[in-house]
Curated annotation (Swiss-Prot):
Signal peptide, first to last residue: none
Any one GO MF annotation of this record: structural constituent of cytoskeleton
Species classification: Eukaryota, Metazoa, Chordata, Craniata, Vertebrata
InterPro entries membership: Keratin (IPR003461)
Keywords linked to the UniProt accession: Acetylation, Keratin
Keyword Acetylation in annotation: yes
The keyword Acetylation is annotated on this UniProt entry: yes
Native organism: Gallus gallus (Chicken)
N-acetylserine PTM sites in chain numbering: 2
Subunit (UniProt): The avian keratins (F-ker, S-ker, C-ker and B-ker) are a complex mixture of very similar polypeptides.
Name this polypeptide is given: Feather keratin 2
An example Gene Ontology CC term for this record: intermediate filament
Amino acid sequence: MSCYDLCRPCGPTPLANSCNEPCVRQCQDSRVVIQPSPVVVTLPGPILSSFPQNTAVGSSTSAAVGSILSEEGVPISCGGFGISGLGSRFSGRRCLPC
């Protein structure tokens, strides 16, 4: 029986020619010989990036709050990290209440 034979109908031939039983055929094995050739694969190095975020949320008095939340013109974030991201410059600071 050929590997490409279709499933035979189960019982009387239906109008749609469908079958409720699985159709499985075992074909002969195929053999493929692959000769390895020298291949150089270059994987790109990792790209490291960070996006520090300093956010001040305020109202119509945000200009006054902005002057409180900065030191020497550099914004201070509540997490203790300055805009430089080093973390040690403003680590002892606390956020002021609004």
